[in-house]
Amino acid sequence: MTTLNRLLESVFEGKRFESAHDPIPTEKIDKAIKQIPFTLSDAQKSSIFQAFSNDITYIQGPPGTGKSYTISALTILASKLGMKTLVASQKKPAVEIVYSKVSNLLGEEGCLFLTDDQNRKEATKDLLQNLLTLARQEISNKDLSNYQKLEKKIDDLLEERDRYAERINYYNKEINAFFNLNEETQRYQDNLKEVNEIKEEVLKKITKIDNEEARDRLLKYVEECRKIRRKSFETEGKVSAAQVLRLNFLVTTVLKNLNIDKEIYKNYGEEILETFIRYSREISKGINKQNLVKKFPVDTIRTSFDDLTNQLYPSRDLENCILSKFLKLSTNLSIRKLLEDKSYLNTLSDFRRRLHWRTPKKVKEFNKKIDFKKLFDLFPIVLGEMRTLHPYLPFKEELFDLVIVDEASQVNLAEVIPILFRAKRFCIVGDHKQLGIKAGGVIFLNKVTERLNWQKRFEDQNQANLTAASAKERDLLVSTSSILDLIRNENNTITSVPIVLNEHFRSMPMLADFTNNEFYKSDNEQSGLKIMTALPQNKCLNSFKNIEVKTPREDSDEDNPGDKVNPGEVKKVYSIMKSIITKKSNADTEEVLNLPPLKDKQITLGVVSFMRDQSDRIREEAPLSFSKDELKSIDFMVGTPEDFQGNERDVMIIAPGVDETCSRSRGFMENDQRFNVASSRAKFYTFFIHGKLPNNMMRMKTMLNQMGIEVKDKKYQDGITPLGWNFLRSNCDSNFEHLVADQIEDFIAEKASDRLMLFNQVESCGYFLDFVVYDQLTKKSLAIEVDGKEHFYSDGFTHTDRHQERIMTLRRAGWKTHHLDYWNWFEDGWIDSESSAVQKLKIYLENFFLK
């Protein structure tokens, strides 16, 4: 039974949906992931493993979290694993983005884009013709040799990187062990000095116990001393001479072994002896581990590992890296090898001719001539807009190994079921916290008609006895539900737990924080999005401007009601548009035009309004104020949140179309999904232009409040200090961190007090960074992390994976990180403020910031 049939059966007959296809082995997926030039987050990897393990998967992609990137990676991996994949979306821009990413890595022949767009269709015909021409040429020995050389070089690089990873894993475990031992030693030292008032020089003279047997023997002696002393208490001080001699012998032996003065024992008794013994053993173990760790070439190995990582998975220019070159060449050679078979050549030729035709009769005639199995052997990746795909594809069950449905919250059941009919596995990608089916386009049926049709065709025809009302509850009605609604519905037995993509790359921190706090973060500290743009140079920038206009909405005049338009908002929108187009700043736009990421750049601009009347007014009147070229220069877009889902711009203007009389519009304007989309479209800056807000517009006021607090918190020099960051001594977890802070503060005071700033426990990318040094002049920043601290775990590969995930996450966000060699800051178990490591840190800071 097909996956679609099993899905429908589970809904209509109340049966639990179970995956029927064998999961792809984890080892194969792991190997394939290493062979594509993407650096994937934990969440992205999890979503990929789920998609290859289950027949139905839901990937939730909040705004700006790399949904298209994940789909592209999943698509390329499926191809490498020998699978045929279809990517379909309700919106063409979503398909275009995935096509661009895939073709950049695989080459134009790496995927087949099926569409009615004439320009795209002509480009596809040209591609097919080029392949037909290329097929006349034999595969040269040079091409084969290049392929073999690239393959061997990649295998060598991957093997070498794995070897370094294993060594880093071992080093990290030992560094972590030293860190934990040393922290325990520091606690003993602090306790002995502060509670027992033992002087530091006494502690430094204590003999180190170098084995467990010696420690246990001395502890036995101490316990025997306790028993003798207890017995003396019980007998009111009457102790035999033998016991006195024994006590004296035991105490003397312990003191001699520890090199401790007898006066300390007289003051504190056996308890202090036990503490000294345990401390002595811990400091000995720490020193032994430190001596081992000091021999590790950690910096060299990390540098080599990073170099290999940059060769294989560069952060920029992916299409020109070695893995992409190999993917392009292997794709090209694979197609050319198949085209040596005349039947494949004929298939390609037939399909090219078929692209010429649009009439149903001709399409049907030419489709019959095409061997689609061979076509999809040539092009295992197919992409297209939902409504245009069907004429190009045979209506054959489980034609594709994997179907990925993007923007799934906007895909109604009537359109998607024929697509899913062709799938063995399908992956639903979307976000139930953004706009749903009503934003997706045409609703096919009148709701009354749909209810009557359901009663006629389905009631009493299924084991679950689903009425029209219960069908609506289960999200089975075309007019109200999407495929995403269906699989998430808890009344159905197919509920799919989403894998949430949680790294946000789109918006400036101030804007992304609002989206995260308002829509994605819960009381759980681990919930919400990692704001990957939260770098110092971005945190110091204001990205929001509130502008209130005094005009009422036109329809507020009861005697002569007009459209749902606030003319003051519209007028201010045009003023800002004019300033951005001409790059002539005014009081409203001076900040945005001088924003470092936008200064002297071509800025794209969008205007979103909750009221269709207002967005239509702006769209219709904009050409009266601006030329076609001027609007094109800012890639101008205006619409409602429904229009904007899936789109973004450098600068967004939110002009809701509101005044103080609009209290009854709150449910519409402040709807969770609608407001989420409207407020998350801007990459760099948002203008909020509005009439007087009704008292009940709480979400708009929350946005103003959060943005206002952010701006208010900027209490240092304007545009210089990262918002919300600070330096608190109470955030230092240990004496060592206090020492590091001392040294950095000394360096700043001596070298660059007017430029450099120190922060600690800085929240960024879902982590807390130990220290961050920020240069107000150059906007450079450096994260300083303590090796061995809580960033490590003790269990094998998870230990390295977590550490490497942290490093790779910060790398993806653009952080430069310096790891402190914790083990070099101690001498014989004591912090050494004069160690070479201190000077090493200061030299590094000077080279990084001042040279």
Describe each model-derived feature in a short phrase.
Residues 40-43, 63, 67, 94, ...:
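Phosphate/oxyanion-binding active-site loops and adjacent basic polyanion-contact surfaces
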Residues 109, 116-315:
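Charged C-terminal transducer/switch regions of large nucleotide-driven machines
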Residues 538-687:
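Core RecA-like ATPase module of SF1/SF2 helicases and allied nucleic-acid translocases
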Residues 21-135, 249, 360-519:
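ASCE P-loop NTPase helicase motor core
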Residues 768-805, 822-827:
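Short beta-strand-loop-alpha-helix junction that forms the active-site gateway
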Residues 442-499, 628, 661-758, 829-832, ...:
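Helicase C-terminal subdomain and adjacent C-terminal extension
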Residues 1-39, 257-399:
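Conserved helicase NTPase catalytic core signature
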Residues 497-579, 647-649, 677-735:
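Helicase-core coupling region on the C-terminal RecA-like lobe
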